[in-house]
């Protein structure tokens, strides 16, 4: 059983989108909200369905609730994050700060990822491959990211995950999150050509 627990601890950073760190890439958001990222997202995996609900907290911060499919017979793993955009050079990454204690991720730990909108209903998330120690400063992390962007080694090969949006979330002018509703213009499923 301990082997499975240790394996889960090793795999968790990859599932969440990167290694965990004590410090954020940037201490405050570099950009306003990207409303294309708001909504309920799903990822079909061998162990089941993982879901992420991304809602606005303010004009530049997100609330992310992540519920990962069970791995190896275990139960679902739920996480709550505060997230914001962190610009490094010309690239934008997301800093996610864990808001509650969990067995696999300490409260206050930071995880980084790159999000790429493929179309209105698909976002591709890629973990970052960083060798910096857990206590690296934001400046040290950004320096390593710039270096890895230049040499093409920032992203873990074949680790990108395509999440599908299944519902939208609306943000009212008063700053409250509106109700989740089915997509107004859902993308038709891709048809395979014979």
Language-model features and meaning:
Residues 20-36, 44-194:
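Calycin-type beta-barrel ligand-binding domains and close structural analogs
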Residues 16-18:
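C-terminal motif of bacterial Sec signal peptides marking the signal peptidase cleavage site
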Residues 2-10:
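Sec-dependent signal peptide recognition
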């Amino acid at each position: 059983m301990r082997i499975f627990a240790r394996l889960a601890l090793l795999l968790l950073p990859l599932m969440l989108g990167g290694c965990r760190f004590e410090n954020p890439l940037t201490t405050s958001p570099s950009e306003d909200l990207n409303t294309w990222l708001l909504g309920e997202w799903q990822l079909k995996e061998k162990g089941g369905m993982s879901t992420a609900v991304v809602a606005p907290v303010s004009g530049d911060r997100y609330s992310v609730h992540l519920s990962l499919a069970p791995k190896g017979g275990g139960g679902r793993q739920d996480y709550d994050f505060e997230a914001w955009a962190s610009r490094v050079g010309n690239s934008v990454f997301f800093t996610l700060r864990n808001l509650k204690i969990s067995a696999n991720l300490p409260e206050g730990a930071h995880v980084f990822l790159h999000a790429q909108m493929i179309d209105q209903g698909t976002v591709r998330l890629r973990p970052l491959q960083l060798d910096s120690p857990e206590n690296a400063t934001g400046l040290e992390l950004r320096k390593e990211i710039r270096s890895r962007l230049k040499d093409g080694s920032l992203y873990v090969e074949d680790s990108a995950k395509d999440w599908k949006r299944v519902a939208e979330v609306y943000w009212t002018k008063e700053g409250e999150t509106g109700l989740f509703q089915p997509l107004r213009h859902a993308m038709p499923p891709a048809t395979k050509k014979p």
